[in-house]
Amino acid sequence: MNKLTEQHLLKKSRFLKYSLLASISVGAAIPFEGMAMSKEAFRIDLSNKLLNHVSQLNGYKDTTNNTPQQIGKVIVSEPKINTYTPSEIREMKISNKPKASNPLKDVPIEDHYKVVARSKSDVGTARKVRPITRCKTFAGIEKTEQSQNTYTPESTEQMPQKPEIIITASSPTVSPASNSFITAPNTPNTTLTSPEHYTTAPGTPSSTPATPYQSTSDSKPNDSLGANTPPNINTNSKAVRRLSFSSSGPQQQAVQSSSQVKSEVPPKPTFVPLPIKKSSTEIVAGMVSNISRVNEMIGIKLAEVTQAIDTTDKKDKERLQKLYTQLTSTQKTTEKLKSRAEEIETKIKIGENKDKIKKLEKELTSKNNKADRLFQKIEKIDIPANKVSIKSQETVPVTTASTEVSAFQAQQARINEARQGVFNKNKSSGGNARKSSAGTKREKKKQEAQKQLSEIKKQEKAIKTASDKAKEVAASAKKETSRTALRAMQDKMNGDSEQLNKIEENLKLLTPVVYNSSTGPTYKQSPKATPTIPLSHGVQRILGEQPEDEEGYLVPIKVQQQPYQEIEDPIPSHSKDIYEAKVSQYINYLNSIQPNQSNQAQIDSVIDGLATEMRKFSADQFSQKLGEIAHLASIKAYEGLFEKLYEIQQARILETQKVYEQAEISQSYAEYEENSRKSSIPVLSRSSSAKSVISSNFEEKSALLQTTTTDESLRSDNNWKNSAPYSSSPKLDKRGLEYLDLAGDAFVQNLKQPDTLTIETLGLITPTQNTTVAKSDSSRKNNVSGSISEIQQLQSEKMRTETLGVQDDLGLDLHYTPQETLTEKSTYLVSSKKKQGNIIKRAVSKVGSILQTNYAENRRRKRDGETSKQRTVDQEGEFGHAWGNENHKESSLSVVSGCIKKATQLISLLDAKRTAILQTTSPSQRRSVSLVLQEIENDYREAIKISQKLQQVLIRKPEDIKAYNAKAEKKLDAIKSRADKHFNNIETDVDVGFNPNGGNSHSMPTANMDILPKNLAVTPPTNVGSLYNSPQAQQFQEDHKNIIINDRSQGRLNLVDSTIVRELTDVDASIYNTAPPEVLKEAEALLDRSQGRLNLVDNTIKKGTQPLSNLSTIYESVSYENLASETIYKTEQPKPSISYTNTSKRKLPIPLFRSAELDKKLEYLDLEDKLLEVEEARIVKEKEAIAKLNQYQDPENLEFKRLAMEALDLSSKESQLKQKRKAIEAEFSLNEKSSSTDVSILRSYSIDDISGVLSDAESNLSRSPSVSGLEDLNNSNVMQLEELKSKHEKIANDYNKELELDTLNKEKIWLEGEIKHLDTEFKPKVTESKPVFSCSSSVGSINSFSNDDDLSSRDVVTPVDTLNIEINKDYVDTYIRVLSNKIQKIEEIQKIEELSGSSSRSEELNHIKEAMAYISNRIQDVEELDEKMLLAINAQLQEHDEKISSLLREEATDILAQLLLQEMLVSDGKSESTLPAGDEEQEDTEVSRQLSSLPALASSNESALALSDDREKECLALGDSSEDEESYDSGFEEEEETIGQLSDSDGDNLKITEVDTVIPLEQEAKKEMQTQISENAPTLNQAKVVNTIVNNMIRNRLDASMNMSNNMVAVGAGDEEESHIKRGLWMRGMYGTNNHGRVENMTGYRGTNKGATIGFDAEIDNNIVGIAYSNVHSVFKFKNSKNNDKELINSHVVSIYGQKELPKNFALQALVSASKNFIKDKTTYSYGDTKIKSNVKHRNHSYNAEALLHYNYLLQSKLVITPNIGLRYGKSRDGVYNETGVNVQEIALTMKENNILSGIVGTKVTVPLKDALKFNNLGLIFQGAVEHNFKEKTQRINRVVKIFDNTFKHNYLIPKQPKTSYNLGTGIIGSIKNTTISLDYNYYLNKHYRSHQGSVKLKVNL
């Protein structure tokens, strides 16, 4: 619709509207002039005019008015003042004419509109006249209405406004035709006023002369009417035509001057046409206003029609009722339209999206057009003319008389009064309507808020949908890594179970072999570094623990063992051949695919191809690729791959042995040794020491082979690979290195085959440089040394030495080597023949023990792998080894090795002597030396701790090594000196041995010394069985035998008592009574200790050839010195050297043992069986627990995350338990040492002999009391395992509950954090030519690295999956806003720099402006962007400076993260509006609930706000308001430091994250926030109120004591006086209210106080001293707060008071109190439309002291007047606090302090009363006091508030208290027996403060 058409329609509607209104107003405001006529004459004249008017409309001209300009216009003149006198009016002739017919009677209502519309063509000229204005003129007291025209030379267009319709009561008027008074019918007269006033057409004679006027407030100055009107004035004003009923020429009218003018109420604006370009909100508002106007018009019409129905006859009622029905239906329609429009307005305000808004705009436009059409129809409605009964009257000639004028004026005054009354009534009704509409608006706002909440919930659902998508992204990203990590954790947990199962199977298989073999050395395997798995950052966040380094190893920082790494071989390895590319493709495929049944066949083909290609690799390439696929070992589908690789590796060993000859190796070694000496490189010489190192290397290779060549070890070791080359000699080629690498493997394979166990493999080995070996058991260090030629000679004599008779040619010479170091002198001086015999002896005796020991040692190696430190064996002190990386040298560990050995010796010595003391002292003697034993025990534990620290220490600098070594040695020397002192004070026997009979006889069995050869020295076993066979243990077993049997028979599974376990196993029972993993560790420790006892029993069985009853025992004494030298910690002590000499073929005598001794030793076999049963039960329960654990393998599962964290710490716990086990093993080192002191085999024995011995042993074991104890121990372990099962079931239940509770909080926050973390952490840089507006998240497979590769040369597997996040259009909008903000900042910086003469930001500013210009030219609307445009813009922006890209990456990411954060905060803050005002508990709960999710949020926010650049930024921290009172700052110095950092720094230096907010904050919102901050500061010292209350309570106590004494004096001499009370206990409860007004700009408060005081005092000679404690709880609510802001104070007050009686009726009272107030502030700030809640906790310390001097004056009327005067000093100090809350980044308030010194003057009157009821000494108390402040010192406060990106600072000056305060009070006191009761009331007031307080006191005289 164009503008022309719109104006045309507007003119048309206005004409129809005001034509209708003019016709309606005929009977209400008819113009008159001259003498009034009668009513009948007026009606007749009006009927004639109407008839003429209708005839003119129908085309007939009126004879009385031929002017064409008057057609279609109605001139409604204002009522004029009558100029006729009363006498003239009375003389008028009044004639009664017949009633005229109504010309519109037969015209239907619908045709009225047509009739009026026909006059449109005849009134065109009338629209060019300026509209007249209307004014109200007052003549004296009477009010009249006048009209005038205003003409302007300029064309103006006046907007149409809503007409004002005033309904007045019926009043007499004057007809202009009849010049007589008439009375209108009883219908309300209607006066119409409008900006478009009635006018007279040009050239038309006016019916009234001009009248002076005064303009009203809604009119403009106009010209006069009548003759003064300029003719032919043509204007563009939109005047409304009037129908003129004037039929006569101009008439005279008297002029009445006006003296008063009263402005008229301005008319309401009419409907404004909608502009073409207006917002939807303005359109809706205009529509609602338009509908309201239409509805109001309909109401007016209804009122008129209703009145007309009541006053008309029956003929017209039917027509009027139809009209009434139409108006009613129209009104209902408009009401519906209005409600619909309001709903649309609400929806537009909420705003879902722009498309919906456009639809609503179209709908509103159509509704508005419909409303216009409806309004036009309403305007056309006309009230039938016949509703007014018009009676014709005769025309009376007009005469002038003063009396008639006065009467008319009086009549007019009554009319005006009536109109004014109606106007006032309408005005009051309008005011009520406005109030009701305001209430309606408030209700609508509430409804709107409810709708907004529903919309917010919808947005939250959208966020949840996005979270689900993020969950899918995270799940796909973690799919590969999580599975591997979980498998590794499970394998780590059940690794021990599988190892124990194998041990059990091997023991069962080796049972018949163990009994016919001798004890041989066990092989200690070198502990390996804990395998590590490189994980992605996503998995690390799931596990909740940061990695140790950038690669992200799945090992906790505290317990991660540094991997051992060989020094890199300078010899280049083989280059990668063509097969490596295929292998890499296969490996990538296996990493990316998810195994299932459908693709299993394809996986098998890939496995076959991979194995075929790897078969072609060299050793290095094979090991490297093997490390890359090690993480796949836990997947069942890939088991076949590792079986094939194992076969390939074994085949390579055999091939290598065939290829290389010994001569090549010897020649290579000789060249290497010579070159090394020339280059000053230390070389192992061909001596026994060198061979010891070589042998140790073979042990390491044995351990490596056992752990890396089995399918089971592949699952538990991800670094399964071959070791690095051993030699770095440039002359040693690749073949030699490989042969050296595999020679040890071949040696170990031979060791596993007892029938081929020879030493020929020693001829294949060469020394290695910098070889890392682990600590091995002492039993493994019996290594044969000699030259290579001697070793080769042994091979030819192998078959000759395999006979059993070779023992006749052997002689044994056992002695110990020095314990500190290994030197070349420590050799085995043996002949080749004796060496052969030693080898055969080991092969025959330990054929089964090797495998058993290897499995046990493999289990211990895995358990110790994370804590034990590998050492470099370096006899000459010149070998080093890389520790973790090349910067950490092993020299630190080599230096302190001497201290480790020294600590080990000291531990063994302490343990041996402690055991000796226990064995050589009786129970009665043991009590006397208990303190000494305790000191020894403490020293023993301290030595163990020092040894552990020495093993774990890692020092880089040599000077630090020496200092640490000296410090450790100093501690060890101190321990040794203390131990020697303790041992010297205890007298014990020198002989320590094994006494099977008990008592104090301690000697050791040995052979007959007379017949032993002189060159054979035998070190007998020491302390064997001392634990189980001590007198105390036997006595204990006998005492508890019956108890154990009963418990077992009744099925009771009792936990083992600590004393029982200590006596039976020498192990603390707390280990058994705790968690099952610790029980497992102790069971393993017992199993290890039992190994030595099995060897002892084995030797005993093999030696026993005579019947057990005939055995005898020979004992040999052993000194303490020998015992100490033999008791060496097993991991450090070398085995004794054995020297063989030719003793011809003499046989050794058979040692004799008692049968009882064998019985005791066989009990150890039972111990082994019972331990195996324990392990079986544990394995079953652990498998059940693991099955339970498998139920929680969902990566998003919270319980699984917790279990994953526990699994990470498993290695640390195992390490701790291992250390504890080692400490316990030290106590049994003597027993384990016995395995190395074997006596040579003298003769063979048969299986029948062994069977007989075993049957006897079983019968003895069945009677052994230790069996019962072990069964109970087993039962105890079963109970612990049952508890483990119940614990896992409880975890499942708790997890389900926790999952339900945290679904809407923790999961949402965590997942949102995941989204933003992926968005920020993986955001690419522009320098890498990646899109600026796109984010990518890549998840790589696990990167495995070889130990022999440097960190810089590790191969990283390419990512297998890349997930591109959809481009977001918000990036563009955000980018634009960031650039705009940055331009402003740079311009500000430039202004400052220009002043200083420097400008460094101009280049960056130019780049930013270029980017802005490009974006503004390319982008007109962000909504029109698509993905291609975004990419094009991105490519263009990359051409700009890198600073722009960095800017986007840093700030835009931050803003987008804050967008999500704001949505979360808004959704979380939705419950704020639901909190009822005044409900403190519910509000506290709600605030706590909102802020308790924020610690998660804290960690989730930290991820959401993480930035991609390298700059350090602090993340937004949302404080926890639920912390308890213990979190308060304790010291004022710390508080001052905190506020100093906050208040003295500017916005950039504040420790607050600078975040750009997306919420636009208007200036008004900022001002409002600043006002709130200035008003809500807690600076009015509310804590001072509490101190005043408490002081009043205690002062009343002192006054009560004084009153009682006065009452007793006033009672009279005839009354009996109570006994003198010396002590009193009293309590007082109080309740009070207070009110503080506004001070300056500080908000006042209202508060309540409630509390209690308890005190105790003593009275001595009328002098009182006492102490009291008060606890008061106060709540202060701030005034002028719509958010229920309040302050809670919990006060603890301690007071000391006293009263001293002075001469001459004087008394002195003193009071000192100190209070500690815990304050909580709860404040809500209104920041625009945002409500920000904050919570604060801080402390206040207050101190008060006062002294009062009283004088007691007793009157004759028994009244007591007590005036008093005194001083009071008060000090209050608030602590610093930091305030945090939702959307509040930080609020800080400095410490404030207030000191007041005041004086007190008052008096008190006591009125005694007669005794009533059971009360005596009754009295009334009236008191008053005036307190004046002499000096008050306050402190200025600095406050800093940071909300979003706006910082508010405010400085406060605490307002001083009023100088004068008043305290008034009254009370009543009385006593019953020894109890005193008083009621008190106090009223305290000053200029700003009022307080009421009531209390009840009860005192009991003790």
Swiss-Prot record:
Residues 445-482, 863-874 have a biased composition (Basic and acidic residues). Residues 1-28 form the signal peptide. SMART domains: Autotransporter. Pfam families: Autotransporter. Residues 199-212, 246-264, 1491-1507 have a biased composition (Low complexity). It is found in: Cell outer membrane. One of its GO terms (cellular component) is cell outer membrane. This is Putative surface cell antigen sca1. It comes from Rickettsia conorii (strain ATCC VR-613 / Malish 7).
